[in-house]
């Protein structure tokens, strides 16, 4: 298991630079066995008890000292049942889960969420992320990867309804975007007197 300062979702892509010896071993095993490894959000007080597995899609570069650049793809969500710290890297017993229902989100919610996502990108405050698949039945995962709030993303990852996730995402962005627009406007006006003009010298 790989504790990181990020949240990954199913079917989203994540580039990683692997440099620690213990994770070189873990990723090397995953490449050799074509298996998954888990990514969980790391906090100052420990790790959250849910995450998502990834598979290595491609080794982008292998360095002479064993470091590597890889491209991974999110696979399955899980909850942690127990930890095993006997190996050099963290291992865990997990239970996999998916959505409890297959009810599609209303089309109007999908369209609104996409609009919010595009606005987030235009503001320049989006987290680095892979190109979203807007046809994904679990669209919320594709769009949420751009949100910079890791605590919110961790909650969203554990939500077991696509319709519910999309509503939570819309609600979050409906509050976040106006604040960011105001911040950007203040930055634009910072060198001026607030009216788009630079203050005159004394």
Describe each region flagged by the PLM:
Residues 1-202:
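N-terminal low-complexity, acidic/polar interaction/targeting segments
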């Amino acid at each position: 298991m790989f504790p990181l300062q990020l949240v990954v979702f199913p079917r989203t892509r994540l580039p990683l630079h692997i440099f620690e010896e213990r994770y070189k071993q873990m990723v090397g095993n995953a490449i050799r066995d074509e298996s998954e490894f888990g990514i969980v959000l790391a906090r100052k007080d420990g790790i959250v008890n849910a995450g998502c597995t990834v598979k290595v899609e491609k080794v982008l570069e292998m360095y002479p000292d064993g470091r590597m650049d890889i491209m991974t793809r999110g696979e399955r969500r899980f909850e942690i049942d127990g930890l095993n710290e006997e190996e050099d890297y963290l291992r865990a017993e997990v239970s996999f889960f998916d959505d409890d229902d297959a009810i599609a989100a209303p089309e109007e919610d999908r369209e609104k969420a996409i609009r919010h996502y595009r606005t987030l990108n235009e503001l320049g405050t989006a987290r680095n992320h892979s190109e979203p698949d807007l046809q994904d039945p679990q669209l919320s995962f594709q769009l949420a990867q751009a949100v910079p709030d890791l605590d919110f993303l961790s909650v969203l990852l554990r939500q077991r309804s696509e319709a519910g996730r999309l509503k939570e995402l819309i609600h979050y962005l409906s509050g976040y975007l106006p604040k960011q627009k105001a911040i950007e406007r203040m930055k634009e006006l910072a060198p001026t007197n607030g009216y788009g003009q630079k203050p005159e010298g004394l």
